[in-house]
Amino acid sequence: MMKVLVVVALLVTLISYSSSEGIDDLEADELLSLMANEQTRKECIPKHHECTSNKHGCCRGNFFKYKCQCTTVVTQDGEQTERCFCGTPPHHKAAELVVGFGKKFFG
């Protein structure tokens, strides 16, 4: 009976040690992932800034990610160029307005 208790205690110790190592590895992976997300967040393009060269790099707003909105600009020479900026599309503005009113009325 004593041998069984010793073996069970040994198994419990080994399992807890191996699971704690796994948890440490998982925490390290999560930390690296969070650091990568923070780096990506720092590299995103803020609202009203130019996104002509990186049309998918706009930052997130309060509720939605900003969209790269482009227009054609004609220079004084008559040359047409495309200029883009990060902004909130009209349907996202409407949704944010509705959510804002909902928060005011319902707390």
Curated annotation (Swiss-Prot):
Main subcellular location: secreted
Tissue: Expressed by the venom gland.
Database matches in Pfam families: Toxin_35
Disulfide links within the chain: C44-C59, C51-C68, C58-C86, C70-C84
Molecular-function GO terms, alphabetical: toxin activity
GO cellular component annotations of the record: extracellular region
Record keyword Transferase present: no
Chain coiled-coil ranges: none
Residues cleaved off as propeptide: 21-41
Signal peptide from the UniProt entry: 1-20
Keywords: Disulfide bond, Knottin, Secreted, Signal, Toxin
InterPro entries in the cross-refs: Spider_toxin_CSTX_knottin, Spider_toxin_CSTX_Knottin_CS
Compartments where found: Secreted
Entry's family note: Belongs to the neurotoxin 19 (CSTX) family. 04 (U1-Lctx) subfamily.
Entry note about domains: The presence of a 'disulfide through disulfide knot' structurally defines this protein as a knottin.
Name the UniProt record assigns to this protein: U1-lycotoxin-Ls1f
Organism of derivation: Lycosa singoriensis
